[in-house]
Amino acid sequence: MQYPEPIAKLIDSYTKLPGIGPKTATRLAFYTLGMNEEDVQDFSKALISAKTDLTFCSICGNITATDTDPCVICRDQSRDQSTVFVVENSRDVMAMENTRDYHGLYHVLNGVISPSAGTGPEDINLPSLIRRLSEHEEIKEVIVGTNANAEGEATAMYLARLLKPAGIAVTRLAHGLAVGSDIDYADELTLIKAVQGRTKL
């Protein structure tokens, strides 16, 4: 059976989300149709707001409200200014913040080096990290928190080679994070132990 065009478009929109196949997209579309109009309006406004009222912090690359740049973490002078935790995305920042154990700064790459995907160092938020480190001599350590997969390891090793001549300590998250695992899926205790047991690259 062919669905009316508005439903077909809605289903197609849902299938563009990660992990959503045609069956789940169809269920979501019909669930949306069953919502009252006010909830649908709120939902659509939230989607639009997420795209128009958010930006990336001009210092660290973390996601922030357009009227809060630099982000609240970069503005917080009580944080340890000597340590920068490099992560792949903003979800990783939230995962670390939820541990309440790390009190330094962050730098969000918004990607990883992936030759197979044609993504090089210049395609992610690496140039701004190098510039940031050169402008702030108080930064003494970079903790590399990229995920424990091939792309994450490649990015970590690239960073280590790049920063070693500058005399900045480059460390990597330690035990507890399984190979292939993502930081934002790890529990808080595992993340705390991984940071505490970090090793030099």
From Swiss-Prot:
Coiled coil: none annotated. Residues 82-178 form the Toprim domain. Belongs to the RecR family. This is Recombination protein RecR. HAMAP family: RecR. Disulfide bonds: none annotated. May play a role in DNA repair. It seems to be involved in an RecBC-independent recombinational process of DNA repair. It may act with RecF and RecO. The lineage of its organism: Bacteria, Bacillati, Bacillota, Bacilli, Lactobacillales. A zinc finger (C4-type) spans 57-74.
